[in-house]
Amino acid sequence: VKRPMNAFMVWSQNERRKIMDQWPDMHNAEISERLGRRWQLLQDSEKIPFVKEAGRLRLKHMADYPDYKYRP
């Protein structure tokens, strides 16, 4: 069972697609670096919808898998 997505992952899912559409040959490592820098530049107020969605996903995950324990 995968862990629920955090706010960055929720945001980056759509942003990654946009970058891949513009630069299909860009390596995944470079895309990830760009996404990380862009996320850090966002204001806290811009992150709120993604934080809320991540919270919703976390609650759903807890309901779906009540005995879940993260084991790396």
Curated annotation (Swiss-Prot):
UniProt main location, coarse: nucleus
UniProt keyword list: DNA-binding, Nucleus
Gene Ontology biological-process annotations: brain development; camera-type eye morphogenesis; negative regulation of transcription by RNA polymerase II; neuron differentiation
GO cellular component: nucleus
DNA-binding region as annotated in the record: 1-69
GO molecular function, one term: DNA-binding transcription activator activity, RNA polymerase II-specific
Cleavable signal peptide: none
Record carries keyword Nucleus: yes
Gene3D superfamilies the UniProt entry points to: High mobility group box domain
InterPro entries: HMG_box_dom, HMG_box_dom_sf, SRY-related_HMG-box_TF-like
Annotated localization: Nucleus
Protein name as it appears in the record: SRY-related protein MG43
Organism expressing this protein natively: Tarentola mauritanica (Common wall gecko)
